[in-house]
From Swiss-Prot:
Species in which this protein is naturally found: Actinia tenebrosa (Australian red waratah sea anemone)
Subcellular location(s) per record: Secreted; Nematocyst
Subunit structure comment from the entry: Monomer in solution.
Position of the signal peptide: 1-15
Disulphide bridges, residue numbers: C20-C26
Protein name listed in UniProt: U-actitoxin-Ate1
Highest rank taxon of the organism: Eukaryota
Principal location class: secreted
Keyword flag RNA-binding: no
Length: 28
């Protein structure tokens, strides 16, 4: 259960970073 949650969080973070790099705008 925790492993799935961690994987999900990692996926979201990775996709968020990709969007940040793609749009050249990073909220973080």
């Amino acid at each position: 259960m925790s492993l799935i949650l961690i994987f999900f969080a990692f996926t979201v973070l990775k996709s968020s970073k990709w969007i940040c790099a793609n749009r050249s705008v990073c909220p973080i």
